[in-house]
Amino acid sequence: MTQGAQRLVSMRALLESGAHFGHQTKRWNPKMRPYIFTARNGIHIIDLQKTITGLTEAYQFIVETVAAGQKVLFVGTKKQAQETIAEEATRAGQFYVTQRWLGGTLTNFATMRKRLRYLNDLEDQRARGEFNKLTKAEALKLDAEIEKLNKVFGGMKTMDRLPGALFIVDPHKEALAVKEANKTGIPVVAMVDTNCDPDLIDYVIPCNDDAIRSIRLIAAKIADAAIEGQNRRESLQADVHGAGYEQEMTAQLIAREAEAVE
């Protein structure tokens, strides 16, 4: 285990979150064999050394992705993941899906973008007071439409292009999201339990994807990575702007000195 990996997450934190508990042995996917430590009382126990390694690699990838100016789409529609995914994605300034994954979200993004723009337009109209010009029934109908659209698209209504990566809780449940990401060439980072197929995932974080504490721990680390990536990007942009300013000042100084000589 590297020093950096130890700093990112401790074995104790993983154990306390229950990240090591897999599914019943009879429900396993044999492809997960390399990530399984042992079996106890009919339950597979995940090798947490592999969890730390996977999380560390995923963390670095997310940092680099966001630093390059791309966004991450967090996906977790199972009940125990919804609140955490929305909170952590929002904290990191990223996008999220916590309701049903709609087919075509990635593979038919042109249509998806139109629906997102429609939602934004409706909200803009309401903010400008245009609903006040309508009948009460018409205004209520549009309010209901906004509420309905926000429930489905609220976590990604400012997403104007495809994300640079997906972070998924339970790729077995989110099979359609994984399929669309694979088809569009978008890398997938995922919490992968013992019943999942790791071959479909670019960055496998083997762990319990059902326990709330495990989901909170891993999702928070991915959000931290996105924040670090954004900070790195802003720092780089500041350096570039600073260098440009210095070059401009130097040029002006040289010009003034040249004028003085003349």
From Swiss-Prot:
Query: Which residues pair up as cystines?
Result: none
Signal peptide range equals: none
Q: Name one GO biological process term.
A: translation
Molecular function via GO: structural constituent of ribosome
One Gene Ontology CC term in the entry: cytosolic small ribosomal subunit
Q: Mind listing the UniProt keywords for this protein, alphabetically? A: Ribonucleoprotein, Ribosomal protein
Q: Which PROSITE patterns match?
A: RIBOSOMAL_S2_1, RIBOSOMAL_S2_2
CDD domains xref list:
RPS2 (cd01425)
Keyword Ribonucleoprotein set for record: yes
InterPro entries xrefs? Ribosomal_uS2, Ribosomal_uS2_bac/mit/plastid, Ribosomal_uS2_CS, Ribosomal_uS2_flav_dom_sf
Q: Which family does it belong to?
A: Belongs to the universal ribosomal protein uS2 family.
Q: Which protein is depicted? A: Small ribosomal subunit protein uS2
Q: Which organism is it from?
A: Roseiflexus sp. (strain RS-1)
